[in-house]
C-alpha cells in the first residue's frame, strides 16, 4: 500500500469498535477501512453512504448490486474491490458463473436483459470515453423508476469513488474470494 494504516490504538474508540466488528465478521480488518479512518469524518461519510446504498430495502437486487460493483472494480483495476465484491456476489448468487463472465457480459447468455442494460449503463458512467445517451436511459426506464435509476447511479458513482481510492493507494486483495 502506498499509505500505511496507523496502529489500532491511534484510531478513535468508535472506529476501533467498527474494526472489531469487521474482524469478527471477516476474520480481518479491511485495509481500506483503516485508510479512510485516518480521516474519521471521511470514514463516517463513506460508511454512511455505503450502508444506504447496500441496504435490504434497496430497489436494486443484491445480485444486481454485486454485478455492478464487481464490474466497476474490474474497470478501475481495484484488486481489493474485485476480491471483496466477488465474494459478496458468490454469497448472494450462489455461483461465480456470472462473475467469471462479467468482463465479456455482452457476449454471454448468462445475463438477462435487465442485467445487460445495467452493465451497459455502468460502463457508460465508468469509462471516461463514453457518455450516457437518451436511448440508454430509455432502456433503463423499462426496468426502473426514477428512484431506482438514482439509486443505481449512486451505487455506480460510489463504487467508482471506492475503487479509484483503493487503486490509487494500491490496496491489495485480502483473500475474501477464493475462485476455484
Please give the residue ranges for each predicted region:
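Iron-sulfur (Fe-S) cluster-binding segments and ferredoxin-like electron-carrier domains
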Residues: 41-44, 82-101
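Short, thiol/selenol-centered motifs that function as redox-active sites or metal-ligating centers
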Residues: 68, 72-86
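Acidic/histidine-rich alpha-helical segments that form the ligand environment
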Residues: 113-154
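Preference for long, well-ordered alpha-helical segments
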Residues: 146-180
Amino acid at each position: 500500500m502506498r499509505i500505511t494504516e496507523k496502529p489500532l490504538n491511534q484510531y478513535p474508540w468508535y472506529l476501533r469498535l467498527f474494526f472489531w466488528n469487521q474482524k469478527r465478521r471477516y476474520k480481518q480488518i479491511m485495509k481500506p477501512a483503516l485508510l479512510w479512518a485516518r480521516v474519521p469524518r471521511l470514514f463516517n461519510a463513506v460508511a454512511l453512504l455505503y450502508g444506504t446504498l447496500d441496504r435490504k430495502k434497496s430497489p436494486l437486487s443484491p445480485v444486481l448490486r454485486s454485478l455492478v460493483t464487481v464490474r466497476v472494480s474490474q474497470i478501475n483495476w481495484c484488486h481489493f474491490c474485485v476480491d471483496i465484491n466477488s465474494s459478496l456476489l458468490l454469497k448472494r448468487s450462489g455461483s461465480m458463473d456470472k462473475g467469471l463472465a462479467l468482463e465479456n457480459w455482452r457476449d454471454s447468455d448468462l445475463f438477462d436483459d435487465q442485467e445487460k442494460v445495467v452493465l451497459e449503463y455502468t460502463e457508460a458512467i465508468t469509462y471516461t470515453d463514453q457518455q450516457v445517451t437518451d436511448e440508454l436511459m430509455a432502456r433503463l426506464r423499462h426496468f426502473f423508476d426514477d428512484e431506482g435509476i438514482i439509486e443505481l447511479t449512486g451505487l455506480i458513482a460510489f463504487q467508482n469513488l471506492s475503487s479509484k481510492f483503493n487503486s490509487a493507494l494500491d490496496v491489495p486483495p485480502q483473500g475474501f474470494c477464493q475462485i476455484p
